[in-house]
Amino acid sequence: MAGPPFALGFLRRREVVFPTWRGWLVLALLLMAGGRGFLAWVQPFLAVSAPVGGEALVVEGWIPDYALREALRVFRAGGYPILIATGGPVPEGSALAFHGNYARLAAATLREFGLPADSIIEAPAPAVRKDRTYAEGKALAAWMREEGRVLGSLDLFSFSTHARRSRLLYRLALGPGTRVGVFAARDRDYDPERWWASSSGFRQVTDEWIAYLYAKSAFRE
């Protein structure tokens, strides 16, 4: 009669330790506390505002009109000599497609809001399949080369949870010679302190968190 498998050298006994009910309770409480901490931390982490007092205010042209109004207030209060609008093509079929690109659309909107035309520069980005924000930063770098202008520092005006990722990708696109600060306009569609309680807030924060992790760890120029 053959012996048990343990005797054949294929298996061996191990002692496994499981938490008691008190241990499971403590573990559950720790997970809940960590989850609540993450919920409170992640939105303001992504929607960062950290300006450096740059030589120009760069505005991502795709942001909504109320955010462009806020950008105009920041431009005037900060005493920036120029405002640079960036952005790629407006999608075909859009009512605003006649502008061609978001840089031109934002510039036109800001002029309507009262910003003098000679204070605005357009730096449109080409159509790309992915990494649109990085393409916007490269378009700005190309404009600087073409104009022979060197911006040692600039402040980027972005939108809500997109801000941290935008700053990261603009830094990569512009290189170490340009310091990049950032402003994050507030999204009016949800309460940032309870972003998980609305579909808009949940979708925006989770999408941007995943996109930021990709940009930080897997993006290659």
Task: Identify the residue ranges that each predicted region occupies.
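A generic structural signal for solvent-exposed, polar alpha-helical segments
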Residues: 5, 86, 149, 201-202, ...
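N-terminal type II signal-anchor transmembrane helix
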Residues: 5-48
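Residue-level recognition of hydrophobic positions within alpha-helical transmembrane segments
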Residues: 18-20, 132, 203-204
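A structural signal for short, hydrophobic/glycine-enriched beta-strand patches
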Residues: 43-197
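A transmembrane-helix-recognition feature enriched in membrane-embedded lipid enzymes
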Residues: 197-221
